[in-house]
């Protein structure tokens, strides 16, 4: 799988994005190289797409596939796209506070530590549905890793569309989120404009 090895804070600077959206509380004191430079319309559209891909850790081909699915659904394409990205299993694990970052959540899912409705799921891109119950498997719960994770994600707010029981390392999807409650700094309309060309 393709991996972008650019340092995280450097990418955040270039995308003019706060690293807190990735679960990282570091701040860069440097300015982006091109700060203040006028960006073209295409440049702005491309930046929004790169931002969404970077936040959710999705590569170009899967991202394009999400867009095509979003286009076929009823409603607004941009909103459908953001909702689909938000419903990825790795993102839900991150939102529940069972992983410090989405990257760590992907690793936890890959290593078969996660159960969805009692069944092991090791696909980070698995899309959860309303009513799904997500938990860390029993064998893994006693691991020191999860104690550390819960300590560092203790102050993180769980979105209203999810319910988390940190002590049991268990959560559930109460409802499908609306765009208004998805807290990511992405203008999805620019992504739609980019793909509509």
From Swiss-Prot:
SUPFAM superfamilies: Alpha-L RNA-binding motif (SSF55174). Keywords: Ribonucleoprotein, Ribosomal protein, RNA-binding, rRNA-binding. GO terms for cellular component: small ribosomal subunit. SMART domains: Ribosomal_S4, S4. One of its GO terms (molecular function) is structural constituent of ribosome. CDD domains: S4. Residues 87-147 form the S4 RNA-binding domain. One of its GO terms (biological process) is translation. It holds the Pfam family Ribosomal_S4. InterPro entries: Ribosomal_uS4 (IPR022801), Ribosomal_uS4_bac-type (IPR005709), Ribosomal_uS4_CS (IPR018079), Ribosomal_uS4_N (IPR001912), S4_RNA-bd (IPR002942), S4_RNA-bd_sf (IPR036986). Belongs to the universal ribosomal protein uS4 family. One of the primary rRNA binding proteins, it binds directly to 16S rRNA where it nucleates assembly of the body of the 30S subunit. Part of the 30S ribosomal subunit. Contacts protein S5. The interaction surface between S4 and S5 is involved in control of translational fidelity. This is Small ribosomal subunit protein uS4. It comes from Lachnospira eligens (strain ATCC 27750 / DSM 3376 / VPI C15-48 / C15-B4). The gene is rpsD.
